């Protein structure tokens, strides 16, 4: 979806496109630069897409997202997402649960039947800084192999602000910008 959006919009209709699976970045970008709100991708995050797929196949299931950032809790509380994602835990909270339950991972045996080898490297890389942009670039290569995309990645809200300031100054035209708060 984002690859098609980028190809259709940049630079013909807008100078650049912003993307991220980080709600903190998206909210910050839209608050600091409301004029850029339409430049920030509205594509659903993997958390929401996965939860919706689970709910479609198992309507009574409870979905739990476990990740590094508490900002995902804000995303899960959005009116349009509330019914999809039931709980969000940070890694720190999950480790606290394991600790309280006396679960020691170093003593657990791996079960080969539980191996999850169906995902792709691009899909697994979404949560890593620059991972969304890398997936978009890869998808663009399949759609339009001759199209070159310049990307910039900002890690931390301070660096994201700098990146957006450069975009506002017209120094990131044609770029795909990814931020991670």
Stretches found by the model and what they are:
Residues 1-181:
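Iron-sulfur-associated redox domains of electron-transfer enzymes in respiratory
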